[in-house]
């Protein structure tokens, strides 16, 4: 079972089921992706190393808010925990959130996995998105993009109030040569409007 398959199976447990239409591997990101596969707008958002929160704020001209859906210790399959503990130390906390520019339609659905031992040192204000917290700490970090996906999801069509397909990405954030979190983000098409 692939690492991404483990993440996908875990999200099904969270009632976020999806069908994968296309997967871009990391070697594609450095060569460049043809605009026939992904238009330049989505390439900019998906491949950018900067703060997604700040990019959304500029695009929407509104403050980006986070809605915490759930934060809890994970209790999943041995293979999923085994995959997570390769980069992230146990015990592991899973966070599910939406990012909004208003209270009506979410822009992003995200799931992240953190070591319980480090999560509080990176979240000065848990009401703010991850990138706002990391910026407040004034630390250098690296986003290690692993995959870009195009997916269909009936459950997210309801949440986003938009028809799919949806772009998504999965990456690790590194700090001081150690991975601090794994993040999976799914983008609403409303971002481009």
Curated annotation (Swiss-Prot):
One of its GO terms (cellular component) is cyanelle. InterPro entries: Chorismate_lyase_/UTRA_dom_sf, Rv2949c-like. It comes from the Eukaryota. It is found in: Plastid, Cyanelle. This is Uncharacterized protein ycf21. Pfam families: Rv2949c-like (PF01947). Keywords: Cyanelle, Plastid. The gene is ycf21. Belongs to the ycf21 family.
């Amino acid at each position: 079972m692939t690492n991404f398959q483990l993440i996908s199976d875990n999200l099904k447990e969270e009632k976020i089921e999806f069908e994968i239409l296309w997967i871009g591997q990391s070697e594609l990101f450095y060569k460049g992706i043809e605009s026939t596969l992904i238009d330049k707008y989505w390439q900019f958002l998906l491949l950018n190393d900067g703060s997604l929160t700040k990019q959304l704020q500029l695009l929407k001209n509104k403050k980006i808010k986070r809605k915490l859906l759930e934060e809890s210790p994970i209790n999943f399959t041995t293979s999923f925990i085994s995959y997570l503990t390769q980069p992230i130390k146990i015990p592991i906390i899973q966070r599910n959130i939406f990012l909004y520019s208003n209270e009506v339609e979410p822009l992003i659905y995200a799931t992240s996995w953190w070591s319980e031992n480090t999560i509080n040192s990176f979240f000065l204000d848990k009401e703010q998105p991850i990138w706002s917290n990391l910026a407040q700490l004034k630390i250098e970090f690296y986003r290690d993009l692993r995959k870009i996906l195009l997916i269909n999801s009936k459950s997210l069509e309801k949440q986003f109030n938009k028809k799919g397909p949806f772009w998504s990405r999965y990456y690790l954030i590194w700090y001081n040569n150690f991975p601090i979190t794994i993040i999976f983000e799914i983008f609403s098409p409303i971002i481009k409007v």
